[in-house]
Amino acid sequence: MSGGQAFSADRNGGGDMRAMSYRIISETGSREDNIKRLKKEIETADAIIIGAGAGLSTSAGFTYSGERFEKYFYDFAKRFGIRDMYSGGFYPFPDDETLWAWWSRHIYFNRYIDAPKPVYDMIYDLVDGRVAADSVIEKKDEPVAAPKKDYFVITTNVDHQFQRAGFDKKRLFYTQGDYGLFQSVNSKLKKTYDNEEWVMKAMESQGFVKDENGVFQVPEDGKLSMRIPTELIPKCPDDGSDVTMNLRADDTFVEDEGWKLASSRYSDFLRRHEDMHVLYLELGVGANTPVIIKYPFWQMTAANPNAVYACINYGEAFAPEVIKERAICIDGDILTVFEEMPKIH
């Protein structure tokens, strides 16, 4: 794969993408050699910066179409002709009761349950597991045992699965929001609001029942309501105004104090490690939002001769030729790659 796109080596990931021309390459060795190299880099890197996109959650089993959609949204599919969870998020439902019934299901089955497959847990085991109290994110933080590797995660995913797997929230930057948060339509309120309690009530009101593990399931008779009671329509707790999801769709997205703090921590982590042996590990990042993770990772790798860029993605694993010698591109399912890694020596 090749192209005449542009690329610059900017340490902060912002850089002028027109600064130099380059070719894109996808071949960096055999699959086995690439996995072996990645395994070594994970073991030897001073720091690992994980950039995660939608492909990681897909690998974890959070698919937006197919069996999961047909199981939990069959009634919406039949009535409205909706074919997947993603497009359903944009559907013009007839009233707020139906709109929020949809969203409560969408949130619950993508945010408040554990991932069907263990890829997040496998990544956690590679980088975390507390061993020593010699590394903290901020000086003002109370000293805590450090992870196996000094790491940070930046992700465009909004499903909270890194935290559910045990990752330290002080090492996470969710750039595009969180399914677990509402924001007010009142633009003057720059706050977000936890929605877990509301989601549980809304799910129950539609007829979902909890199984022996406390997870909501479709009842045996299959009867569900596609509306929530009017009194359950979520409102802003501060001024009673309507709420929307805290998901980046336009300039109304609220970057609250938690978001700003995470952004600051991420920038500080990059600064402190800019000349060290850093592994930029990109997982499941596609071409929809390359300026958030992919391009900055390329730029920072080019700027630091001690850095290595690794990409695992199904059908979209490539890198600029300028960093070819320090690039590891693996085309395939992320879970499968991490399952193979312990077997390769």
Show which residues each predicted segment covers.
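Conserved catalytic alpha/beta core of Sir2/sirtuin-type deacylases, generalized to analogous enzyme cores
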Residues: 1-345
